[in-house]
C-alpha cells in the first residue's frame, strides 16, 4: 500500500500523552432520581435467555448446565456508603407486606413471572419515596436449562399453580405487585384490600387500580377519581358520626342538628328511572267555608293625584312633557301601581257597559217572543 504523506498540520501536532481512564462515580442522590431502566438497562429478559424451572428435586442444584445470565439486565454490585446502606435498610423494613423482602419469601414454583425479576419498585405516588429490592445471583444460577419442547407443559403448570395460589391467598394482603412478563389467569379483583369493601359504593361509582397497584375510586357521575372510599368515615362532614348498631344497622348521626338518618350525608343524589307505582286519584273536597286572608291592595284606598289621572287619559304624543328622570324610583313604582288601578277601573266600566247592553238585548228578545205568543193566541180565539 502507498503511504500517505503527512500534512503540515499533522507534522506540527505534539505527541499524544497516554493517560489512565477513571470511571466517574455517580452521586447517590442522583442515582435515586434516575429511572431504573436508564441506570441498569432493561430489566425484563427474553424467553430464550431464561428457561422455566424444572419440577424435579434437582431443579435448583448448582451443578450441571447453569443458565448464562444476561449482563444487560443483571446489575453488578455497587459499592455504597454506610449512610446509603442504612437508608436502604430502613426503607426495606418499612416496605408494605405484599412485596417480597427476601429470597425465602419468593415461591420456587411460582413460574417464570418471578424467576427473572431483578428489581421490584414500590409505587412512588403522592411524593412517597420508593424502595427497591434485588434477589441474589444464586436464584438465577440455580435454574437449569430446559428444552423448548417442555415449555408448553411448564406454562400450563404455571397458570394452574397461579390459580390455586390466588385462591389460597388471604384477601387482606392487597394486590400483588409483581405481574411482570405475564398475566395470571385469575382476575385480580379478588385480591383487593377489604378494609373499605364493607361499605357499598353509591350508584355511578366503580373501583380500579393504578399501574403500580394502588386502589382508587371512579365517580362516573362527575367523571372524577378519588383515592378514598366515598362513604368512608373521613368523608363525613364536620359534626357527623357513623354508628353501627346491631338493632338498627348502620346510620349517620348529625350532632349539630340533633338528627339521624340512614343515607350518607355526602352520597350523591342520582335520579332513578324506575317505574313509579300506580297511584289512585282521590279528589279532595275543598272546604269553601274557610276564609282566605288576602292582604288588601294599598292602591285601592290611596288617593290618586289629578295629574296622574290626566296623564292616564291623555294621548301618547304628550308623554314628552313629563320629565321622568326627576322622579325617584320608589315614586315611580307607586305611580305604576296607581296607573294599573286606573286602567282596571276603566276596564271595569267598559265591561259593565257591554254587560248592560247585553242584558238590554236579552230583555228585548224576551219581550218580542211574548208578544208573538200573545198575538198567536188572540188569532186562534177569533177563528
UniProtKB/Swiss-Prot annotation:
Cellular localization per UniProt: Nucleus; Cytoplasm
Protein's name according to its UniProt entry: Protein salvador homolog 1
GO biological process, one term: hair follicle development
Keyword Phosphoprotein: yes
Assembly and interaction partners: Homodimer. Stabilized through interaction with STK3/MST2 or STK4/MST1. Interacts (via SARAH domain) with isoform 1 of NEK2. Interacts with ESR1 only in the presence of STK3/MST2. Interacts with WTIP and AJUBA.
Effect of residue 358 to A: Loss of interaction with STK3
PTM comment: Phosphorylated by STK3/MST2 and STK4/MST1. Phosphorylation is not required for SAV1 stability and may increase the number of protein binding sites on the scaffold molecule.
Occurrences of domain SARAH (ranges): 321-368
Record-linked SUPFAM superfamilies: WW domain
PROSITE patterns: SARAH, WW_DOMAIN_2
Role this protein plays: Regulator of STK3/MST2 and STK4/MST1 in the Hippo signaling pathway which plays a pivotal role in organ size control and tumor suppression by restricting proliferation and promoting apoptosis. The core of this pathway is composed of a kinase cascade wherein STK3/MST2 and STK4/MST1, in complex with its regulatory protein SAV1, phosphorylates and activates LATS1/2 in complex with its regulatory protein MOB1, which in turn phosphorylates and inactivates YAP1 oncoprotein and WWTR1/TAZ.
Coiled coil regions in record: 344-373
Modified-residue entries (Phosphothreonine), positions: 210
GO cellular component, one term: cytosol
Expression across tissues: Ubiquitously expressed in adult tissues with highest expression in the pancreas, aorta and interventricular septum and lowest expression in skeletal muscle. Expression was higher in fetal than in the adult heart. Expressed in various cell lines.
Protein's organism: Homo sapiens
Keywords of this entry: Coiled coil, Cytoplasm, Nucleus, Phosphoprotein, Repeat
Residues of the WW domain: 199-232, 234-267
PTM sites of type Phosphoserine: 94, 136
Amino acid at each position: 500500500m502507498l503511504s500517505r504523506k503527512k500534512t503540515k498540520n499533522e507534522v506540527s501536532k505534539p505527541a499524544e500523552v497516554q493517560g489512565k481512564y477513571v470511571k466517574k462515580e455517580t452521586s447517590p442522590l442522583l442515582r435515586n432520581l434516575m429511572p431504573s431502566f436508564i441506570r441498569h438497562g432493561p430489566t425484563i429478559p427474553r424467553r430464550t435467555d431464561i428457561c422455566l424451572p424444572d419440577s424435579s428435586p434437582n431443579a435448583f442444584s448448582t451443578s450441571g448446565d447453569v443458565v448464562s445470565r444476561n449482563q444487560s439486565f443483571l446489575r453488578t454490585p455497587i459499592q455504597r456508603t454506610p449512610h446509603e446502606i442504612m437508608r436502604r435498610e430502613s426503607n426495606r423494613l418499612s416496605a408494605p407486606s405484599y412485596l417480597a423482602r427476601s429470597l425465602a419469601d419468593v415461591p420456587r414454583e411460582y413460574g417464570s413471572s418471578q424467576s427473572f425479576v431483578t428489581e421490584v419498585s414500590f409505587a412512588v405516588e403522592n411524593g412517597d419515596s420508593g424502595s427497591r429490592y434485588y434477589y441474589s445471583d444464586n436464584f438465577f444460577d440455580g435454574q437449569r436449562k430446559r428444552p423448548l419442547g417442555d415449555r408448553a407443559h411448564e406454562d400450563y403448570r404455571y397458570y394452574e399453580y397461579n390459580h390455586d395460589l390466588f385462591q389460597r391467598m388471604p384477601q387482606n394482603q392487597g394486590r400483588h405487585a409483581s405481574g411482570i412478563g405475564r398475566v395470571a389467569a385469575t382476575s385480580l379483583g379478588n385480591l383487593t384490600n377489604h378494609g373499605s369493601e364493607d361499605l357499598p359504593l353509591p350508584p355511578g361509582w366503580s373501583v380500579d387500580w393504578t399501574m403500580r397497584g394502588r386502589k382508587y375510586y371512579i365517580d362516573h357521575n362527575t367523571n372524577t377519581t378519588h383515592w378514598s372510599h366515598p362513604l368512608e368515615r373521613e368523608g363525613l362532614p364536620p359534626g357527623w358520626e357513623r354508628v353501627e348498631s346491631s338493632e338498627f344497622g348502620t346510620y349517620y348521626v348529625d350532632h349539630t342538628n340533633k338528627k339521624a338518618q340512614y343515607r350518607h350525608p355526602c352520597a350523591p343524589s342520582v335520579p332513578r328511572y324506575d317505574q313509579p307505582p300506580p297511584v289512585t286519584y282521590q279528589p279532595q273536597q275543598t272546604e269553601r267555608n274557610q276564609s282566605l286572608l288576602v292582604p288588601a291592595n294599598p292602591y285601592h284606598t290611596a288617593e290618586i293625584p289629578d295629574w296622574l289621572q290626566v296623564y292616564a287619559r291623555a294621548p301618547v304624543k304628550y308623554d314628552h312633557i313629563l320629565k321622568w328622570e326627576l322622579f325617584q324610583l320608589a315614586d315611580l313604582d307607586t305611580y305604576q301601581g296607581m296607573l294599573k288601578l286606573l286602567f282596571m277601573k276603566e276596564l271595569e266600566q267598559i265591561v259593565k257597559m257591554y254587560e248592560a247592553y247585553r242584558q238590554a238585548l236579552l230583555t228585548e228578545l224576551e219581550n218580542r217572543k211574548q208578544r208573538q205568543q200573545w198575538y198567536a193566541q188572540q188569532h186562534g180565539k177569533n177563528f
